[in-house]
Amino acid sequence: MIFGKMKSLLAVLALALLLAPAAQAAPAKLSSAWMGEHETFVAWYAKQQGWDKEAGLDLTMMPFDSGKNIVESLAAYDWAVAGCGAVPALSTPLSDYLYIIAVANDESANNAIYVRKDSPILGAKGTNPSYPNVYGSAVTVQKADILYPKSTSAHYLLATWLRILGLSEKDVKLQEMEPTPALSAFTGGVGDAVALWAPLTYEAEAKGFKSVANSKDCGITQLVLLVANRRFADQHPEQVQAFLKMYMRGIEALRAKPAKELAVDYVRFYKEWTGRELTPEMAVADIQSHPVFTLDEQLAMFAPGGSVQKALNEIVDFSISHGSFTPEQIDKMKGKTQVAARFLEAIK
């Protein structure tokens, strides 16, 4: 009888040893690419809480200066997921290798064009009656020297602003420059205007620069998207879904907690990611000015005829007018074959 009990005990121990590796399996490493801004804070905050590990992931986060650089880095860094603006997600050459899997936020109020406080551009407002809050005129903006990041949301805003004023990019002098060095150059006296996105917009305002146009006042929607490496997502859909669960948990935290409570973490995040200072007041403003969307809201946005489709249609038109695309590429962009709502649908 004792021998029988020992055999049973040994069998239980053997089974426990077999199951232990599965129970203690290391989280899957998931590489990701981001900019030092709002959508990245959501992922950073979720990782700080350990929510990536709870989702079975070990999220690594690589920093970049722009969404264009993120997409162009895909071949070199082979990241799995990323956050970037809709313009580079749709129009950058490697965008064919991406899926659009979710919306990180709406940054329409946070892309803006700045001038110095003595700029003649501030002397005219609402010259186009359809856009009463937009500054500038064909006379004051023509031949202006403008610093901007090409093929980005800020470029989309710049082109729209010029169109509102009856101008085109041929009517001004454009200097292609990433936002951080562009703000430094503008501060040093280079250029007549600079196109930026948040949180650099708050730094521009702190320096006394004045906004003459933002995306919201210009009537365009600027969505920041979550994208996935198409090859990786096809091979590991469960990891992409786990990432979305983690990110949606971060969005729920932003919706539930007052911005003032999150500001301390946001200031720390910004310092870690950019090496630059952000005041608690700026952090609160940035959190409050970036709407984020729950899973149910996102599913509605991604539905046929939803707001995502409308916003992407407008950006496709902009991208086609500003790029050299083959008919096949144009058909792909118009067909929005990159949009993959199935990853969101899988985590309902």
Labelled PLM ranges:
Residues 1-11:
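Bacterial N-terminal signal peptides that target proteins for export
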Residues 26-169, 173-176, 192-195, 214, ...:
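Short, glycine-/small- and polar/acidic-enriched structural segments
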Residues 36, 63-67, 106, 151-155, ...:
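Solvent-exposed, acidic/flexible segments
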Residues 40, 71, 86-89, 155, ...:
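Extracytoplasmic/secreted envelope proteins and their assembly/folding machinery
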Residues 181-272:
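Pocket-lining segment of extracytoplasmic ligand-binding domains
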Residues 234-324:
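Secondary-structure end/capping motifs
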Residues 309-348:
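Conserved C-terminal helix/tail region of periplasmic/extracytoplasmic solute-binding proteins
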